[in-house]
Amino acid sequence: MSARKSFCVKTPWLSAMGDVPAHLDYFGGTLYQAVEACARNYPDHTAYVFMGKRTSYRAMLQEINICARALKSIGVRPGDRVTVALPNCPQAVTVFYAINLVGAIANMIHPLSSEKEIEFYLKESGSLFAVTLDQFYHKFEAIRQNVNLDNIILASIKDALSQPIKAGYMLTEGRKLQKIPKDAPILRWNEFIRRGRSYHWKYRAEKGADDVAVILYSGGTTGITKGILLTSLNFNALGAQVIATNPMFRPGDKMLAVMPVFHGFGLGISIHTMLMNGGCCILVPRFTADS
């Protein structure tokens, strides 16, 4: 067997990149562990702001761990796919990292997808669980008999709002929501979280940087959209690269998270890059010129 050959790769572009290092050491753990390590350094910094309501890194980690315990309480196991059909809201951040913490895979999809598209995403990923908003429940219920879902968890935007804003929301947007039958086979977010508070068994999975953590979907411009498997290392490397090429960044800096969490830029940069480096995400659930 011949000895491994050494290759000299020319990198002329480095001369134009100033003080950007030619080599970076990437965080060797999971998505959650990267954020957890950062939170230890900045526990009282604001992790994200949603409709004026601030959440610290300390509080965010607590919410993620309770959510992870809730996922275990409903039977989510390492390697399971959990579909997340949410806009940029606190529940999306919480459940995304909780899924990673229990060793499952987050299948991120557009919450405004059609019923047919949702059915495709659920079947393509083999998802057994789904998390979405109450306003999208009827689309999931319409295709439920065609897929293999064990549980649908329904979150609500109002649950993430401060009291004054919640009152205004219920007078405007809240009135537009279709009623969900009381006997609907779903689990409301608040009840889901209560289960997490009551779960006291092991919930942290032993996963590493190279394990698949996320499924995002291609644009489908040349055919049927395809699921793209991404590891924790993919996101952690991106987070390190973005900061290395933006030396003006400082912990506490804010980013307007307009790009959605089912999009590579939105999830990888607006959310994970900021949260693994002490930044603050301004979560925008629906982009308009006014918002």
Where are these predicted regions, by residue range?
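Conserved AMP-binding/adenylate-forming core of the ANL superfamily
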Residues: 25-27, 36, 44-89, 93-97, ...
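Conserved AMP-binding/adenylation subdomain of ANL enzymes
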Residues: 236-254, 262-291
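Structural core segment of the AMP-binding/adenylate-forming
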Residues: 74, 101-191
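A short helix-loop-beta submotif of the ANL/AMP-binding
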Residues: 68, 81, 87-107, 111-115, ...
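Conserved AMP-binding A3 loop
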Residues: 56-58, 204, 213-237
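Conserved structural elements of the adenylate-forming
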Residues: 63-66, 194-199, 228-250, 258
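Conserved pre-ATP/AMP-binding loop-to-beta segment of ANL
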Residues: 43, 179-217, 224, 247-254
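AMP-dependent adenylate-forming
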Residues: 8-16, 33-56, 203
